[in-house]
């Protein structure tokens, strides 16, 4: 369905202030009473413009200098609809967009609302239809359903009248129970539909049937978003049976890595994830286990017995500003420093021999650091540094950064004001199952400079409209059988 008329401006209502924050409760979207339980996706936008949160979200949108132009473009593409005059008086308190299935490239989509004023809504559709292909409507119960073809309207009507509704579906109710009804937007994705689509895609590529069931049965995906005076909150959940149940941990590496990171990703127990990936690959590629054994024989160590135990603890990946290229850092806490040193010394030797690159050992703070020099790499020169020390394995692309990792940084990420503020804004608890942090205020201009140095043209509009973005932090945590994903983007 091409996004037109009410659907376009419902989306703008979401951006501009379609209610957020506060409230409480977990009532289902009203459209769930008519949307068939077989639907693949439901996105419910709160268009109750009388909400007090409307002012907050309007203020948030106005921080972006390109917002007025975005509204004008949307209006022009929708028959010059005026939000205040045409849309606001017509829409009901909720607009829902429904994917009936994932067939035909995901185009089996309809939109629903209960018009505030039927005449105003009819006028809205007529005006929106003045340009491009028409948007058609029909009535299903108390709801007006819109689509770009009569076939889709008929498909929705048939599905709605012949089976149970989303409001009766337990997976849907469980997913919605975690989402505040006053949020600007709530979204639900039927897990079975997604899993089947993934399995079909993998099977089409030669994988065995039902490959993803090795991980578990995906029941649902759900998410919400809402704004406050500082920025945008978002929260999502993944329901899988059996539950993923990752072990929560208190990250300590932010207190050991330098401050000023543009990007920082924290993880734990990567051994479990790697085992799952290896199992899936083994099922997909009949010769994989044999080939892996041959590689292990050359390297002189076992992935399962030697490497994976080293990945059982906290790990971090970080990016720092540098010229001409950023500095990359990987630090993994290892239980056996001596084993880590042996494995990575052997691995670096094989890499150096196979790629014909230079290798040497540098003493840094009493630690032997292995330097790999890639003389044949395209400019600028590329060097990498590896070391195992004090229960950690470290990799970086900058010698000075390796020295900080070994001897201790001048200031740590834990003490970085931007990182501390991002954690506070996101409400991140002391223990999570992983998190990712981005310093957008410094990182986006750095990325623009890097792209420009590579010959790309960065529009001035892109620079202006990303300037209000300060930080973003996303973290995962357990909630019963759900894996929750929560976060906050700070906008000033």
Where are these regions (language model features)?
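Structural boundary/hinge residues at secondary-structure and domain interfaces
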Residues: 19-109, 113-131, 166-222, 227-324, ...
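Sec-dependent bacterial lipoprotein signal peptides
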Residues: 1-17
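A cross-kingdom marker for long, charged
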Residues: 247-251, 259, 387, 467-492
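A conserved glycine-rich beta-strand in the N-terminal activation segment of trypsin-fold
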Residues: 133-198, 378-460
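Extracellular/lumenal glycan-associated surfaces
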Residues: 45-49, 108-114, 142, 147-150, ...
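Short, exposed beta-strand/loop patches in secreted or surface proteins that constitute
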Residues: 134-139, 224-225, 358-363, 384-387, ...
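Flexible, glycine/threonine-enriched loop-and-boundary segments that flank and lead into catalytic domains
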Residues: 367-381
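Active/binding-pocket-proximal capping segment
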Residues: 333-364, 409-413
